[in-house]
Amino acid sequence: MNDNYLILSIESSCDETSLALFENNKLIAHKISSSASIQSLHGGVVPELASRYHEQNINHLFNEILNETKINPLTITHVAYTAMPGLPGCLHVGKVFAKQLAVLINAELVPINHLHAHVFSASINQNLTFPFLGLVVSGGESCIYLVNDYDEIKVLNQTHDDAIGECYDKIARVLGWKYPGGPIIDKNYQENLATLEFIKSQPAAKDFSFSGLKTAVINYIHNAKQKKISFDPVVVASSFQKFAINEIIKKIKYYLNLYKLNHLAIGGGVSANSLLRKKIQSLDVISYIPEMIYTGDNAAMIGAYAYALIKNHKKSILIK
């Protein structure tokens, strides 16, 4: 049996088109093209624009990888792609490209759960030890997992309303700041100015819920504007970030203690947040934190997770 794998991976779940090439677990090429600058003109992601962007760029990125690596595409053994979750039109572009390519080059098709790939995004350049607690915080999801193996991933807590990243984007937009909101709010964060209390903290065991926080912050801004009361946007943004990150940390501590775990892996776009990373690193556990380039949507995490599944004769769990 051939144990040498050449894996092309594809990510197209939202507004990033990304392709990567792995020789076994070694990343040898990685391309990301984002439509965020286009989306920012509309204040957020427009699904139709995002899927059209994927269609325009996916072949170009594939050709860039071929030119850069000089590989013969017929030597690719596996084509991994994000199967779910994501924007339907965007996922469709990646899926069609992956399927057509796999047929043309006679490669094995590997559908991947995007969220579980985020869980393992830190494994691109380090080994993870099972069992561990997994945290995925992004524009679409806020989830905590118990991870016993590559295909044994149990949801412990997840949001049933707005994801944390979505709240960042919407609050930034109401403040008049550009999309995406996460990096801008984080850049402007000042702990000594985080003085506002919008809502009360929730019990640690309760599912993630950021809708009430988002609504309270936006109402505060709207009320101030309507009454012509001046306010400092940095105070509002800092207060929001401090509360939101503290809620995440509180839940992490709860589940680490509940399951007697001392390993923690984080992923997703919000895992790039400097306050979250700082607080994670201060916990008395072994933490796996992805490099900044691997925090957002990217094909490297898809390929790394695909390799682990292939190598260990496992399949991605195609449910959240």
From Swiss-Prot:
Supply the alphabetized keyword list: Acyltransferase, Cytoplasm, Iron, Metal-binding, Transferase, tRNA processing
Which Pfam family, an example, fits this chain? TsaD
Q: Which GO terms describe its biological process?
A: tRNA threonylcarbamoyladenosine modification
Binding positions (substrate): V136, V137, S138, G139, G140, D169, G182, D186, N273
One GO cellular component term, please give it: cytoplasm
Write out the catalysed reaction. Answer: L-threonylcarbamoyladenylate + adenosine(37) in tRNA = N(6)-L-threonylcarbamoyladenosine(37) in tRNA + AMP + H(+)
Transport: is it a keyword of this entry?
no
Which cofactor(s) does the record list? Fe(2+)
The molecular function terms of the Gene Ontology recorded here are: iron ion binding; N(6)-L-threonylcarbamoyladenine synthase activity
Q: Report which superkingdom the organism of origin falls in.
A: Bacteria
Cell location: Cytoplasm
Cofactor binding: number and manner = Binds 1 Fe(2+) ion per subunit.
Residues binding Fe cation: H114, H118, D297
Q: What is its EC number?
A: 2.3.1.234
HAMAP family on file? TsaD
What NCBIfam families does UniProt report for this protein, alphabetically?
gcp_kae1, T6A_TsaD_YgjD
Protein family per UniProt: Belongs to the KAE1 / TsaD family.
Q: What does this protein do?
A: Required for the formation of a threonylcarbamoyl group on adenosine at position 37 (t(6)A37) in tRNAs that read codons beginning with adenine. Is involved in the transfer of the threonylcarbamoyl moiety of threonylcarbamoyl-AMP (TC-AMP) to the N6 group of A37, together with TsaE and TsaB. TsaD likely plays a direct catalytic role in this reaction.
Provide the protein name. Answer: tRNA N6-adenosine threonylcarbamoyltransferase
